[in-house]
Amino acid sequence: MKGFDSKYKDLPDYILKITHQIWEEKDVESINQFYAKGMPTRSPQGVIYGAEPVVKATYATLKEFPDRQLLGEDVIWIGNDDEGYFSSHRIFTRATHANLGVYGEPTGKKLSYRVIADCACRNNQVYDEWLVRDQGAIVRQLDIDPQKYAHKLIQDEGGIDKCTIPFNQNTPNEVPSDGIYTPPIISKENIGIRYAEILKQIFSNETNAIKKNYDRAIQQEQPGGFTGHGREEVTTFWNTFISAFPDSKFTIEHISYTEEKNQASKAAIRWSLVGPHSGKGSFGNPSNAPVYVMGISHAEFGPRGIKNEWVLFDETIIW
């Protein structure tokens, strides 16, 4: 890869190794080397710029969870030397809540949850990042209700009028023009496009979308640390979530995919859902509050459709 250290054989190797170096080798200061100057890190909580706040947050997380492991389940990627590279890195995390931190007094509980990080890379650096963490899974394992956790965050920041506004469609983009990520040109027929069309059908409430496109034995990893098996449970998950936002707009934000010999075809989609909480579903009775959902989904395809799916959004931010 042009501009990258020769010790990295490809983009997945680069992503997996720098993640291990930063977190498990505890070389936190190497973030200053691997993160480009002024780069944005966007998450449901908001956006931060540059390496310094990432370094600070990493130290804080490692203090609270000193034995944290980041097991890279997959890196779905696209790109080339001319247009740059993009990775969607799905991580299964294990950690012990050992010290005081953002989740309160230490409980000694052992946690497991997923994170997906979408990174644009060039010249041995990450220069754009979108990150979604399964906060619902974390707080549930700490015996905290996600809605109550969200309420406490708001109160701790001084109430609704003073608290940090989550990332939304109006969040300013303060990235310099030379740091803006432009997706590489991809073919019109690939597994990423196919998955994007399936998600569009689901969010358009097409009744046969899941039956037509999912394997009967589908396993779906859901936000909150839940798992669904079979088309019926997958249908229930999507319907319950979507019914909370019947007047919202669903948008495909980014597509990446991997189609390699001797591997399942895989796709990664970053998507958004924008609109009022105007229906009854996953988030209780309608409040008509404006909502922005930052979601990332991964899928593996087999001969009978999607056989494994991972859906991630931060339900605590929605609450």
Describe these PLM feature segments.
Residues 1-319:
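C-terminal and inter-domain tail/linker signature
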